[in-house]
UniProtKB/Swiss-Prot annotation:
Family in the record: Belongs to the LpxB family.
Uppermost EC category: transferase
Pathway: Bacterial outer membrane biogenesis; LPS lipid A biosynthesis
Pfam family, one: LpxB
This protein's name: Lipid-A-disaccharide synthase
Lineage, opening ranks: Bacteria, Pseudomonadati, Pseudomonadota, Gammaproteobacteria, Moraxellales
Keywords noted in UniProt: Glycosyltransferase, Lipid A biosynthesis, Lipid biosynthesis, Lipid metabolism, Transferase
Amino acid sequence: MYGTCHLSTHKLKIGIVVGEVSGDTLGVQLMRSFREQGIDAEFEGIGGPQMIAEGFNSFYPMETLSVMGIVEVLKDIKKLFAVRDGLVQRWREHPVDVFVGIDAPDFNLRLSKSLKEKNLPIRTVQYVSPSVWAWRQGRVKGIKATIDLVLCLFPFEKNFYEQHSVRAAFVGHPLAKLLPLNNSLVEAKQALGLNPEKTYIALLPGSRKGEVERLLPMLLGSAEILLKKYPDVEYLIPAISDVRKKQIQDGIQSIAPQYAQKLHVLENQDQESKIGRQVMNASDIVALASGTATLEAMLLHRPMVSFYKLNTLTYIIAKLLVKIQYYSLPNIIAGKKVIEELIQKDANPERLAHEIEKLMNNETAKIQMMQHFSMHKQLISGNTEDPVQAIMTLIQ
């Protein structure tokens, strides 16, 4: 274990690996928090554009790890192993004081294991717990052996780890603290230059190429059904890059060209822009792929329908392993069904259109929004620890 005097004689070196946009956001917030607390540190590993803009030294593109699904991962396994081995070699020659794996558990837990197997003097932290409480609970043994500290976003996760004698800290979800409890829909619409009097529905097919390929046709199909019935409603689709924007626009021209004027594709204006969040915030109803974005929509207090369609083989395998009743974070946090979840065959244009239409009823939407508000308050009222202090306590 490192002593305080060891740390005071050199600049702290922190290795971080993130695999997607949400991890990039957590990573840049962590970097800023270290600096705001006057801790002299340098950061390296795999980071996203926000982290790189903050001075992060990224050895590989973040997109290298943006692979979802068991079948998809198997296709890229050699590349992922090469990246892992490259990082281990780098940190064997130039050790960091602590490695913080942010989300991306399948990659980061293996990387932490490799660092421990090489007996490198590196403390290991997993920021964002893998869903061990949901499926593959046997992984908690591996986490106990290879991870020195788990930083949990939700209180029920810390309780789970403590039951298994794993060191954990509940640090709260940064978004719960960042997003205000009082949130104006009218102001959000005006911020995007939208008409506050109009009804907008957000369609979020995801940020990865494969997700958009799989989910956009269903979203556009549901919009077609609803536009025939509600021609004045307009649709907002966020795109995180020019490449994704072109993919979505090509999809619209292929699937629903007659409604192109009602389907607006919006993209990030700058590095700090969060177009997905802005679009959800400016929408009366949100339809989105189950994942971190469902938590964001909940914290914005927007009525939503969640869905997911996996590769068929991936879904069959996952179904055998998953031990929880719900898939979306709002339902998992609440421990009950708060939002509708459409999985696999239920995720089709007709069913999605039907669920969106139900939320057009103001009373139904209002009930869901009140539940979101209540859960938001719960996530910021708990006793949370500062992630930087939790990490510093570990390495001192």
